[in-house]
Regions:
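Structured alpha-helical bundle/scaffold domains in large eukaryotic membrane-trafficking regulators
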Residues: 19-23, 78, 177, 309-316
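N-terminal domain-start signal
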Residues: 1-23
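Terminal, non-catalytic domain-edge segments
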Residues: 13, 17, 230-356
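Aromatic-lined, polymer-binding surfaces characteristic
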Residues: 11-14, 28-194, 206-232, 238
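Short amphipathic alpha-helical coiled-coil/interface segments
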Residues: 35, 197, 201, 253-257
C-alpha cells in the first residue's frame, strides 16, 4: 500500500492528461488502464493484490496517499471505477477512523482521507477534518514554515506532507463551504495557505545548489526527490509566485533529478528503488522506512500533468537563484514573508479560488 499510494499520488496528474497519438500518450493510456485495474484489485478481498487495509497505525498514512491520488486525478482515476469498487474504498477509508493519528503531520492524513470522502459524496467526519486543520494552522511558525507537531524540525516534511495536504484539504472544504457554513476553523484560509506555500517554494528553490543538489538534512531523507513536492505542486497548479519563472523551476528541478537519478546507483537489479539517498545506503534509513516508503520520490513529477505545449515546458531554461548567485550574475534579494494581510515582502500573493 505504501508503494502504490505514493507512486499514484505522484503520477495522478500525468495519468489524467487526455489521450493522444504520441508515443508517450500511448504509453500513458496503457499505464492508466493498469492503474485502474490495480485500484480495483487493491480493495477486492478475493484478489491476491488486496492491500493491508485493516492493519493499525501506518495504514492511515499509506491510505492517505491513495486518497490524495484520487483528489489529484479524480476524473481519470476515481470516476471510471465501478460502483462496487467505489463503495469498497469508501468502506476502507471510513474504517480508518479507528486509528488515532499522532500529534504531528499525521493529522493531515486523517484530514486528507476525510476530505476525499466529502468530495466523493460519502459521509465524512467533519470534526476530524476541522480539528486537524486548526492544529496545523496553530503550528505555522512563519516565513512559509510549519512545525511538525509542537516542536519545529528542520527537515523536508513541509514538502513531503504539510503544505500539499493542508492546501488540498482546505480546497475541498472551501468548495463545500460555498453551500453551507459548517466549518469552525478560525485562521484557516485556502488562499493564505497557498501564499505560505509560495514562500516556502521560494526558499526551496534557493536551496538547490548550482550543481543541482539539495542539503541532506532531516529525517526521511531516503524519500529523495520527494523533497521537491511543494515546488512541483506550485508548478502543476499554476501557483508559482512572480519571483519564480517556469524556466528556472524546470531547470532547477531537472538538475536535482538528473543529479539523483543520472547514475545507476538508485535501483536494484529488479528495478526497484534502493534504501538510501543516492545509492544503496541502508544505514540512513529510519525505523519506519521500507522500500515502499521510497516512492515518495515520485511526488516531484506532478508537473508531468501539464500538457506538452504548456509554458512550463516550452519556456526557455533559466538559471535558478543559487546558480546565478555563484556564477556572479544578478539575483533577487530575499526577505521574510509577512502574512498578516496575505502579502509577502518577497512579492508572493494569494492565488485565485480554487482550481488549476
Amino acid at each position: 500500500m505504501e508503494c502504490f499510494g505514493r507512486l499514484m499520488a505522484g503520477l495522478a496528474p500525468w495519468l489524467s492528461l487526455p489521450d493522444d497519438n504520441t508515443t508517450e500518450g500511448t504509453h500513458r493510456k496503457q499505464l492508466r488502464e493498469w492503474a485502474l485495474k490495480s485500484y480495483v484489485n487493491a480493495v477486492d478481498p478475493k484478489s491476491p493484490d488486496y492491500l493491508l487495509w485493516r492493519q493499525e497505525g501506518q495504514t492511515l498514512v499509506d491510505a492517505a496517499y491513495i486518497a490524495e491520488s484520487f483528489l489529484r486525478g479524480y476524473d481519470a482515476l476515481w470516476t471510471p471505477l465501478d460502483s462496487l469498487t467505489k463503495q469498497r474504498y469508501i468502506n476502507e477509508f471510513t474504517q480508518l477512523r479507528r486509528v488515532d493519528p499522532s500529534y504531528s503531520n499525521w493529522l493531515l492524513f486523517s484530514a486528507t482521507v476525510e476530505s476525499f470522502l466529502r468530495k466523493a459524496g460519502a459521509p465524512s467526519d467533519t470534526y476530524r477534518i476541522s480539528s486537524s486543520l486548526r492544529k496545523i494552522e496553530e503550528w505555522y511558525v512563519g516565513d512559509g514554515w510549519y512545525s511538525d507537531g509542537p516542536n519545529f524540525a528542520f527537515d523536508y516534511y513541509n514538502s513531503f506532507v504539510i503544505h500539499p495536504m493542508y492546501i488540498e484539504s482546505l480546497e475541498i472544504i472551501t468548495e463545500a463551504g460555498k453551500h453551507k457554513n459548517i466549518w469552525n476553523m478560525p485562521g484557516c484560509d485556502y488562499q493564505k495557505a497557498i501564499t505560505r506555500a509560495q514562500r516556502f517554494g521560494m526558499i526551496l528553490e534557493r536551496l538547490i545548489s548550482p550543481e543541482g543538489t539539495l542539503p541532506v538534512v532531516g529525517r526521511s531523507i531516503t524519500y529523495r526527490t520527494g523533497s521537491l513536492q511543494t515546488l512541483a505542486l506550485l508548478a502543476w497548479r499554476k501557483w508559482l509566485p512572480k519571483e519564480l519563472t517556469n524556466g528556472q523551476i524546470r531547470a532547477g528541478m531537472t538538475a536535482v533529478i538528473e543529479r539523483m537519478f543520472g547514475n545507476d546507483r538508485n535501483f536494484n537489479e529488479k528495478g526497484f528503488l534502493t534504501l538510501g539517498f543516492n545509492g544503496s545506503q541502508p544505514g540512513i534509513s529510519d525505523y519506519y522506512t521500507n522500500n515502499g516508503s521510497l516512492y515518495m520520490a515520485s511526488l516531484a513529477f506532478l508537473p508531468l500533468g501539464l500538457p506538452a505545449d504548456d509554458p512550463f515546458w516550452t519556456d526557455a531554461a533559466q538559471p535558478w537563484t543559487s546558480k546565478k548567485a555563484w556564477d556572479g550574475d544578478d539575483f533577487p534579494r530575499d526577505h521574510r514573508c509577512r502574512l498578516g494581510r496575505w502579502t509577502c515582502e518577497s512579492g508572493c500573493g494569494p492565488a485565485p479560488l480554487p482550481g488549476r
